């Protein structure tokens, strides 16, 4: 059964975001190559498939299934904070102090309980450090002369040069991948 969520989305040049998404899935099913992955389940993919969305007029939301919007927004806010503590994500998501969230899980809990713990990071009921994951890389990128706050730099640069092609944020810090609970 397919659950449909109705969203008001305007048409872009190539159709709605959902139409582009479904066309991408069809293309991947027909032309994709099966690959192994770290989970042992495997994936099917194609190289370089692109979709483009004009965010001034539309939002690329999947509408053929329930969208975990609260989880998406919570995780994004957590990344923007630069936090590496999975329990902070739980606070944002559930809106309660971490002491009241013992046993509550987020999308990152399993990573904190397995990979991060194996890497030697703090893992208690109220603190679950993940190492220098996405938000840390966005807000505290290790650089030769200190740290770079990529989000602050992009926001500042967009103000002064909105047409620049250099507004880039990356979480792929090759020097830190081996100490991340879940590398990008």
Walk through the language-model features, giving the residues of each:
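Terminal, non-catalytic protein-protein interaction segments that mediate quaternary/complex assembly
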Residues: 15-184
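Methionine residue identity
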Residues: 1-4
């Amino acid at each position: 059964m397919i659950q449909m969520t109705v969203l008001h989305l305007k048409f872009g040049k190539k159709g709605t975001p959902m139409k582009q998404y479904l066309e991408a899935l069809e293309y991947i099913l027909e032309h994709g190559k099966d690959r192994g992955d770290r989970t042992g389940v495997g994936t099917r993919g194609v190289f370089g498939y692109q979709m483009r969305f004009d965010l001034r007029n539309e939002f690329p939301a999947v509408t053929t299934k329930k969208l975990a919007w609260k989880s998406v927004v919570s995780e994004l806010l957590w990344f923007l904070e630069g936090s590496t503590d999975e329990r902070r994500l739980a606070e944002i998501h559930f809106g309660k102090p971490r002491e009241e969230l013992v046993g509550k899980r987020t999308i990152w809990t399993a990573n904190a309980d397995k990979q991060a713990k194996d890497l030697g990071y703090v893992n208690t009921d109220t603190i679950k450090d993940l190492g220098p994951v996405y938000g840390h890389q966005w807000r505290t990128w290790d650089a030769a002369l200190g740290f770079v706050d990529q989000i602050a730099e992009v926001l500042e640069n967009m103000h002064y040069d909105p047409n620049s092609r250099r507004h880039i944020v990356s979480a792929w810090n090759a020097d830190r991948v081996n100490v991340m609970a879940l590398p990008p």
